Amino acid sequence: MPEQQKYFSTQDGTSLFYRYRPAADGSSDKAIVLFHRGHEHSGRMMFVADELGFDDFAYFAWDARGHGYSPGERGDSPSIGTSVSDVDDFIRYIQSEYGIKPENICVIAQSVGAVLVSTWLHDYAPKIRCAVLASPAFKVKLYVPFARTGLKIKQKWRGNFFVNSYVKAHYLTHNVERQKSYDNDPLIARAISVHILLGLYEAAERVVADAQAITTPVQLLISGSDWVVHHKPQHDFYNRLGSHIKERHILPGFYHDTLGEQNREIAFVEMRRFIRERFNQPLQQVDLTQSHLFGDSRREADELATPLPVCSPRGAFWATYRASLKLGSRWSEGLRIGQETGFDSGSTLDYVYRNQPQGSNAFGVWVDKYYLNAIGWRGIRQRKVNIGKAIQTASAKLREAGKPVHVLDIASGHGRYVLDALTADTLPDSVRLRDYSPINVEAGRKLIAERGLQNTVTFNEVNAYDRANYHDLQPRPTLGIVSGLHELFADNDLILNSLYGFGEAIETGGYLIYTDQPWHPQLEMIARALTSHKAGSPNWVMRRRSQQEMDQLVEKAGFEKIHQWIDEDGIFTVSLAVKK
């Protein structure tokens, strides 16, 4: 079938180029999606369709931002997170435009493309059939000593800049034709922006460390003589994968361009078998809904909840850390609120949202500014922005369907993140805010009055985990919101009470916005040093839920995820699901 060249739009409105080859036998239900390595483009990946020789699959390959025919400065993207979001947009576009469900899609990705796909598998938990990852660039070999540190320092000094690839074509593949085509291809982007290169390292480190969250069937191909990337992170990634179906093939003598090597048939034999086996069986999914009882996140939370010997080095360190926070609360307003109400309280959350450093003196303001700029609080503020996007998206869908917008938020804190998302031209028909804390309810009602929203917004003291509190709601909610609540409780049976409540209250075609925290780089600091507002839980110990675990719990309540947002550090997700 002839190849077609088209464009699709990402969520920020950028049009990215892609190539499409329909299935040779006329089939329209399965697809293989190809992601090129760094510097290259889709034109250098479509040969994979010929090598595989599958006539019953459609083939898609994109040009990533800043590559090939796609827009953007060559070798650049707004961020790694944006590029990963583009991957999700591409798969969703294929589903909507061609009617091919994710569970009937195989993804094949190489080098940098494999890092983007791995991050996507971790952060978005898509239900694809399988993935083949060839020589993922989890750690690029920078032969100059301290090169990464130097790039970071230089970037802080002069902002973003570009570095050219040192890799010659004859170090990528033994195949002379591939070498020549690489050297003479005008679409090759030989430079890469430093913020993308450094972002690639950071995303890769996070995904390799937390690979147990990925349960997609994965085949990993490792080039045995790779001059470009390190092997150890590739093996670490494989060893930690949560996939029940996974394969690793080390290809002796292969250079970095695994799929374009001279003897690539060795790799393609394994790829054909793996892909056929996956599609000859039903979609394989790992049930994670009992992860609060056993598994990696339960073990991690139990370890964080285990007291440290006071006289041990770690025990002494965290005791000193706690003392310094208590001392700092004399001057820093944020630390004071955290110490008095809990660092996971609605009052703390509202203070973080406002993001205005305060203190009893100049030193206190400086401490407060440092405190508010912590990576977790930055993620919280981005979560607020993403919730606003989700509210606007869901409201628009309801209006388009001719339905009213009746909002129910079951754990609102002070309600600021919902109220800030309301605008005069898109005001919902009604908004019901709830929280179990009388302090939060009082503060929220004050905010409502300040904004003159009493005719639209109400705020009541209600327990989100009591199923009876979702019965006989009039008017019935068409948009439910639960933000930041489930992250505070490890027990899945408990949070299912609220999700089932939403499922009973919201009619078919309504929407649910929910959040998750699949990753956090400061879990131990939070558990050892920060206090909680929850009764009987003085220490703030969190059990992380992978995105797949959270999605599965939401599905049990009758919802299906249709969109997702995530911050650049991969800490907090915001998802939009529709009631089926």
Q: What does each of the following model-derived ranges do?
A:
Residues A49-E73:
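Conserved alpha/beta-hydrolase
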Residues P252-A301:
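Catalytic active-site module of serine/aspartate enzymes centered on a nucleophile-bearing elbow/loop
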